[in-house]
Amino acid sequence: MLRSLGAASIFLLLIAPALGQNPAAKSDPGQEQRNSGRSPVEVVRVFYTYLTTYRPLGIPKGRAKRALWPLMSKRLVRELETLQSCEDDYFRRYAEYLRANQFKPGIGWLEDGLFSGPNEAASPSKFSILSSKTVGENRVDVHLRFTHKQTYCCGYPPQYEHYEGVVTVVLEDDRFVIDDFVARGVTPLVRLSDGYAGCKGGQWVGRPGEPD
């Protein structure tokens, strides 16, 4: 029977199992939902591989959201959904006001990297894991270093800036998931779980926004 298949068909049969084994960084985001066998550091590595691929500013959306959401804790997902509700409420109420006055939106998280930091740290091109530390029962802090690449025109060489942060991983439903983040070198030192003053209960309670 193998003779009738031909050499090409036999080759395809032999490599078929390998074709189904995709690395995490290249797999479809929907396939990352089952990460029960991963260590805290492995979960962080997969999460930040996606983050440095999509580089979302503010709340992840689209493909970034589909990739990152399954790797987050239920608490963190609820927090981001609340922020999204506040963001929707803000633009529903003030979009016309912002356009008329040419004001920048007054949402604190809109241009931040929620899992890497503000300003240039918001869009890292690379990351490295420096260390990990158990900080409680089924709770691990992973220390990260981010690299931001600044490119220039006219033949000038790129410049690289480095930032650091700590991501917290917790055990939930027998798997490790991302639960919190704090950027280092930022004053005041604020965790993502501390929330934002302008957002309460899914509604925007801050100011509409003014020029700097």
Q: Where is each model-derived feature located?
A:
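Core segments of small alpha/beta cavity-forming domains
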Residues: 32-111
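Surface-exposed, charged secondary-structure patches
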Residues: 81-155
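Residues embedded in well-ordered secondary-structure elements
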Residues: 6-9, 133, 156-158
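Bacterial N-terminal signal peptides
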Residues: 7-17
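Boundary at the C-terminal end of the N-terminal hydrophobic targeting segment
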Residues: 18-20, 25
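Low-complexity, intrinsically disordered terminal/linker segments enriched in charged
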Residues: 136, 141-166, 170-173, 177-212
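Positively charged n-region of N-terminal signal peptides that target proteins for export
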Residues: 1-4
